[in-house]
Amino acid sequence: GQIISREKAHAEGIPHRTAHIWIIREKEGRVQILLQKRSQNKDSFPGKFDTSSAGHIQAGDEPLESALRELKEELGISAVPEQLHFAGTFPISFAKEFHGKMFRDEEIAFVYIFNEPVNTDELILQTEEVESVQWFDLEEVCEKCEKHRDIFCVPTGGLEVVRKYLDKVKTA
């Protein structure tokens, strides 16, 4: 493949790979996911709740390397490879205008699950990327994210990968 900038990939809709990390926990018998509220300065979906952590896979990197890097950069979580569980991939494809510019996204997202204790008060948020974080009930987000695009920009394909992974783990 060729090396292109993030800006060019989204200006021209060039296919690329991303790493998505979903932080989960069980509370009172229900699965919760940690969502990040995107910074108001983001070039897409500013101020919306999104995947726990995500980012482009850099040239020469493997998806797992990028996932570990994004967790550290965005949330200050120093994870080791054994703590990230590969759950699958899904495509993202859309074009939408933000801040007066077209944003075209054509990506394959590699999904990882992080199911370790997380104290949100101790996270070190990358303020250019992340405004805040909040725990949500997984099923509630699945129900609401399509109807409430004013609040959530969570990719539904990612939620499906997470749910399938959890179903598989439950029956294993």
Predicted region positions:
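Nudix hydrolase/Nudix homology domain
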Residues: 7, 47-49, 53, 88-172
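The catalytic Nudix box helix
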Residues: 35, 52-89
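A glycine-rich, hydrophobic loop/mini-helix early in the fold
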Residues: 18-56
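Acidic, metal-coordinating catalytic segment for phosphate/diphosphate chemistry
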Residues: 1-28
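Short, well-ordered strand-loop elements centered on a beta-strand within folded domains, enriched
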Residues: 1-3, 29-37, 121-125
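A residue-level structural signature of the nucleotidyltransferase/glycosyltransferase Rossmann-like core
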Residues: 13-14, 33, 133
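Active-site micro-motifs of SAM-dependent methyltransferase domains
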Residues: 41, 73, 143
